[in-house]
Amino acid sequence: MEENFTRQKVDTLNITIYAEQDSKPTAAQLNLQPFAEEKDNRRLNFKAKDIGLVNNPKQSDLAIVIAPEENKAANELAEKLLNNQNLRLRITTGYDNVFEKVSEIATELEKALELGLEITDFMQIYRRGITMDKVEHQLAIFTNGIAKINMDRPAVIGDGITLLQKEEATALANFFDTKKENYKLKKFVPASGAATRMFKFLHDFMSGYNPEKETINGYTNRVKDNSLQVFLLGQEKFPFYKEIATVAEKLIKCPDMENENLREDARHYSFVKTMISEEYFDYANKPKGILPFHDYDGFAATPVYEHLKEAAAYASSKGETHVHFTISENHLNGFLDAINDARAKVEAETGIKIHFNFTYQLKETDTLAVGLDNKPFREEKTKLLFRPGGHGALIENLNRLDADVVFIKNIDNVRHTKMDTITLYKKALAGILVKLQEKVFKYLEDIESGKINEAELDEIIRFAEQELSLDISPDFDKFTLENKYQYVKEQLNRPIRVCGMVKNEGEPGGGPFWVKGKRGRLSLQIVESSQIDLDNKIQSHIFSQSTHFNPVDLVCGLKDYKGNKFDLSEYVDANTGFIVQKNRMGKEVKSYELPGLWNGAMAGWVTVFVEVPLKTFNPVKTVNDLLKPAHQKPA
C-alpha cells in the first residue's frame, strides 16, 4: 500500500484471495472491475494464492480466506494471518461463488471508505453481517435526527377500534376453531430481556441502605418510596419465598439477635441480598421468562410454563402447538431447563404435543454507536461500539418463521390459572384475522383472474375502508381502470395484524392512533410517547385524549393470497426509531434503536384494532406486581 489508506489517501489497496483452487483468473477478472471511484484516486489490486502452498503469508491490506468451514488448512491460515496482524476475512462459500463473494466484499469496502471509515471498521461491520447501506442510513439519522410522529387523532371505539361483545367474541373463537386445522399456527414470545428493572428498587435498597446506621423503616422514610415496604410485607406470598428464605436464614448478620427490630431488619436485608446478589440467586440478571412467577401445588411456575399452557389452549391444531422464543444467547441453558421442565407438565395436563425453538437477536440488526460529534465511537483505537437494535430488530426473527398465523405476546404478560378470558379473546382475534384474510384473498384472486368489474371494485373499496380502516386516495375515481386494479392490489396485498387494545388506565407505553404519513394519508399505528413531540400543544392534546393502551396482544398473518411468505422488511418505516443517549466509559454516546416491533417495524401492515378486556393484560413490570390477584393462587 503506497499511503495510509485509513486517511483516504490510498493509491492502491492490495487484497489477497486465498482459496484451495487456482483463483488467479478470478483475481484478474476482479482487477478489471471499476470498484473505486475515479475521484478518489484509489484502486483495488487483487492477487490470488493457493491455501495449500502458503507457509508465510505476506502482508496485504486485506486477506480473504475462502474455503468450506471444515477446511483445516484454511482455518490454520486464517489463524496465522490473524497472528501476523494481517487484516483478514474468513469466508465460508462454494468455490463457484468466489468472484461474486469477493465482488460483494470489494463493493462494501468501497462504500465504507466513501463514508470515511477505516478498513478495520469495515472488517468489524462486515463480520456482523451489517451492510454499508444500513450504516450510511444510521449515520444520517444521527446527523438529521428522527422526525416525530404526526398524529391526526386517537383511535377510539367506532373510529379505529372495534368493540366486541362477549357473544361476538365467542362466535369468532368458534369460527377460528373450525378453521385452525388449515393453518400453521405459531406463538412468538420476545423473551430476551433481563429482569433488572423488575428489581430496581431492591438494588437501590442494597446500595443505599447501611444497616449499621439506620433501620429499614428509617430508610423507607428517607427515600420516600413505599415499594420496599410492600415487598417486605408481602414477601411470604412470593412463589420463591421459601427457597430463598432457607438460604438467607443461614446468612443473617445481626449485632444484637436479642433485639427483635434489629433481628427483623437483618432477616429482611439478608433475604433481599440473597435474592439479587450474583453469588446466590442473582434474579436481577436473569431473564424474566425463567423466574418463578406463580405458586402452584408442588411447584413454582415460570412465565415460560404459562406461555406454553396458553399456546396449548389457543394456538394448537392437530394435537400440537409450536412456540418460538427470542432469547439472549447467554441464557440458553437456563431457558432449555425451564422449557423442558414446563413442557413435560403442560403436555401431561393438556394432552397437546409442544414443539419449541429459539432464536437470538441477530448481530446484523445491531446498530453503530456514535459520539456526540456523530462520528463512530471507538472503545479502543480501532474497536467500534455496537448496540443491540432494540425489540424492533425482532422483525427479522419474525420474518424467518414459517407460519400462517402467529400469536405475539410479551413474556411477562401472564396470569395464574384462570385463562378462559385470555383464550377466548386470543381465538377471537385470530377469528377476525382469518375472516379478513379470506375476503382479502378472494378479492385478490378475482382481480388477478380478471373476474372483478369496475362496479365490484367499489365494493372492495368499501370493505377496505370500513373493515380494514384503510385511507383510500381521494383521487381513486380519477384513476384509469388498470391503475385502479393495481392500486387496490397494492393496498390489500400486505401482511395483516389484528391487535388487542385495553382501556387506558395510566399504564406507560404505546397507544392506538390515526397517523398522517408523508403524503397526508392516514393509517392506524401503535405510537410510543417517545415518538411524539409533547411540546407541541396539538400533539400533546391528541395524546392525552387516547382511550386505549397497547398491551402487545397481536395475531398476525404472514403469508399472501398465494401462500408465499411476505418479506416483512419491506413494510418497515425505516425513518422511525429512537435515538438513545448513554454513558460509556465516562463518555456520552448515542445509539439508534430500530423502529419498534409493533411500531415502525409494522408500519406498512394492514392494521385492525379490537378492544379486549383488561383481564387479558397482567404484566409484571416490578416484582411487587406478583402480589396482585392475577398472580396469586386462587382461594
Please name every model-derived segment:
Residues 1-3:
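Non-Sec secretion/translocation targeting segments of pathogen effectors
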Residues 18-23, 65-70, 93-95, 327-330:
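Structural motif
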Residues 33-58:
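A short, well-structured beta->alpha microelement
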Residues 51-72:
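Short, well-ordered secondary-structure micro-motifs within conserved domains or adaptor modules
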Residues 78-113:
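Ser/Thr/Gly-rich flexible loops in soluble cytosolic domains mediating phosphotransfer, phosphorylation
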Residues 111-161, 291-295, 318-327:
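Low-complexity, highly charged intrinsically disordered N-terminal segments
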Residues 154-199, 203-505, 509-526, 530-535, ...:
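Domain-scale recognition of functional cores that engage charged ligands
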Residues 412, 427-466, 543-635:
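Conserved catalytic alpha/beta cores of large enzymes that bind or transform nucleotide phosphates
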